[in-house]
């Protein structure tokens, strides 16, 4: 044991001698290194299997002890350091802390992982912020271990982005088949309290004991009474873009996000509800139609206070605003889509029943203006361009790689070729980030299926005589290229979900 100016080394040595399996304790003081030969003899005479060097700078003595242990044929990995300085054995409770540091080293337990003497009791409940697949899986694992979980989700259902997907990569498994049983388990688990349409507004306390204030927005529908009969939505006169369908279809002001939603009950979009916005002067058709009388348009928000010991932030992601990247024509050319829009287009539960078609122009009878929509009777594209890294790895937008874009773009290529065998598919990529198990094999499979893979930056998407032209570079062949396509899918960069930074503070 090394000398320390701020601690009673004799007392620590006496304490150490009484620890389990401790054979001998020596105080080295400030003297020079002991000889390795002498230490070797002491190790052999005491049959030592582990040596703990304790003090402010125990690493100073480690080389000679390592040499001595090697001379005996012992395990040099069993030379353990118990650093008082590194682990903060100073000031109040310094002696207790120093003893704990020595005890941990003696028992082979890292001090950073051990309980600190005098710590407060830990609340075993966990708050999980975010009800996507990460939050769902975390909630189930903790709840199945017998611990209370509070799962907070700001939308009207759990499921997150994964609920929007058709297939997963690289196995091409059904996304809903994986996700929906987990969603049901969360909704029925006795150890999970699910709070949808909720946001965390304040967190106080310290690790192991947090007090959390949650604001739950009014749903206006009693989830225990609602039977999801859809009669309320049938009479609702308001139509707005569906968030779940990434805006490519419409929903009502009273709606259920998707058929497998949990809770499986309707909710009211107060921003677009005529009754709420007019303060009760207009509409109210849903209230009159509901056979269960479970709609209350006068419901107000409420505040919920909980106490937990752990907080998991699983708030997920959003897509970068791709309209800022003007060279790709998003919002200008009707058949330029984001990755999430294409996910919903190709999904069997989507607006076209999974048929991949180009948009159709029609007259909006209400506004008397022409608009572009996806129709199940639409025309399939003859050629599709998939552009990687839209907004990713770009100093103007996101300097980082979003990690998933390469693989889901390859998945899109497979789905397109599967549903439209004679279509021409072009993958424009910068670097193929196939980093996971089976990813490289999946990339090779897509190439073998006939997808044209072009490496290089994509410069622009333009329109010429009602035909989209994708211009870019082909690095492998040292040339500039142009391809005529009917549809463009943008692999848009990911950004943290809104409010994540605020939560972290």
Question: Language-model segments: what does each one mean?
Answer:
Residues 148-188, 243-278, 302, 396-454:
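Rossmann-like dinucleotide-binding cores of NAD(P)H-dependent redox enzymes
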Residues 1-13:
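N-terminal basic/disordered segments at the start of proteins
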Residues 205, 230-242, 309-310, 314-322, ...:
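Glycine-/small-residue-rich beta->alpha transition segments that form the dinucleotide
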Residues 132-134, 157, 227, 231:
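Residue-level detector of alpha-helix initiation sites
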Residues 10-70, 89-101, 163-215, 429-466, ...:
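N-terminal Rossmann-like dinucleotide/flavin-binding domain of flavoprotein oxidoreductases
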Residues 16-37, 64-83, 113-117, 155-181, ...:
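Non-heme iron-sulfur electron-transfer modules
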Residues 126-150:
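N-terminal Rossmann-like FAD-binding beta1-loop-alpha1 element of flavoenzymes
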Residues 82, 96-122, 246-276, 318-418, ...:
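Glycine-rich dinucleotide-binding loop and its adjacent helix/turn
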């Amino acid at each position: 044991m090394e000398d320390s100016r701020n601690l009673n080394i004799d007392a620590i040595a006496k304490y150490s001698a009484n620890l389990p399996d401790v054979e001998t304790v020596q105080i080295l003081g400030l003297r020079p290194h002991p000889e390795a030969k002498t230490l070797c003899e002491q190790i052999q005479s005491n049959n030592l299997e582990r040596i703990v060097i304790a003090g402010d700078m125990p690493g100073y003595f480690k080389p000679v002890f390592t040499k001595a242990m090697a001379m005996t044929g012992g395990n040099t990995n069993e030379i353990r350091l118990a650093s008082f300085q590194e682990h903060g054995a100073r000031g109040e409770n310094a002696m207790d802390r120093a003893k704990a540091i020595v005890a941990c080293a003696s028992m082979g337990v890292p001090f950073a992982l051990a309980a600190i003497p005098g710590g407060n009791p830990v609340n075993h409940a966990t708050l999980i912020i975010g009800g996507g697949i990460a939050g769902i899986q975390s909630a189930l694992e903790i709840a199945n271990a017998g611990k209370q979980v509070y799962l907070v989700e700001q939308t009207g259902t759990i499921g997150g982005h994964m609920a929007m997907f058709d297939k997963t990569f690289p196995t091409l498994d059904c996304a809903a088949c994986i996700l929906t049983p987990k969603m049901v388990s969360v909704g029925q688990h006795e150890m999970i309290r699910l709070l949808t349409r909720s946001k965390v507004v304040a967190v106080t306390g310290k690790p192991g004991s947090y007090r959390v204030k949650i604001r739950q927005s009014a749903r206006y529908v009693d989830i225990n009474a609602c039977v999801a009969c859809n009669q309320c939505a049938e009479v609702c006169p308001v139509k707005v873009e569906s968030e779940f369908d990434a805006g490519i279809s419409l929903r009502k002001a009273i709606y259920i996000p998707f058929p497998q939603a949990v809770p499986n009950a309707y909710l009211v979009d107060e921003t677009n509800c005529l009754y709420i916005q007019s303060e009760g002067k207009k509409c109210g058709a849903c209230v009159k139609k509901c056979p269960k009388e479970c709609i209350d348009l006068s419901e107000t928000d409420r505040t919920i206070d909980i106490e937990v010991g752990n907080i998991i932030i699983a708030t997920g992601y959003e897509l970068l605003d791709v309209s800022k990247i003007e060279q790709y024509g998003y919002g200008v050319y009707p058949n330029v889509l984001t990755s999430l829009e294409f996910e919903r287009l190709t999904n069997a539960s989507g607006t076209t029943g999974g048929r991949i078609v180009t948009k159709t122009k029609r007259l909006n009878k209400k506004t008397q203006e022409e608009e572009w929509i996806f129709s199940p009777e639409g025309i399939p594209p003859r050629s599709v361009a998939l552009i990687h890294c839209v907004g990713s790895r770009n100093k103007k937008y996101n300097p980082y790689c979003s990690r998933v874009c390469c693989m889901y773009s390859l998945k899109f290529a497979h789905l397109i070729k599967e549903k439209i065998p004679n279509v021409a598919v072009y993958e424009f990529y910068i670097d193929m980030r196939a980093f996971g198990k089976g990813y490289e094999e999946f990339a090779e499979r897509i190439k073998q299926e006939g997808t044209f893979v072009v490496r290089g930056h994509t410069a622009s998407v333009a329109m010429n005589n009602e035909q989209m032209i994708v211009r870019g570079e082909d690095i492998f062949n040292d040339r500039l290229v142009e391809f005529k396509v009917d549809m463009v899918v943008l692999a848009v960069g990911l950004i943290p979900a809104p409010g994540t930074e605020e939560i972290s503070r």
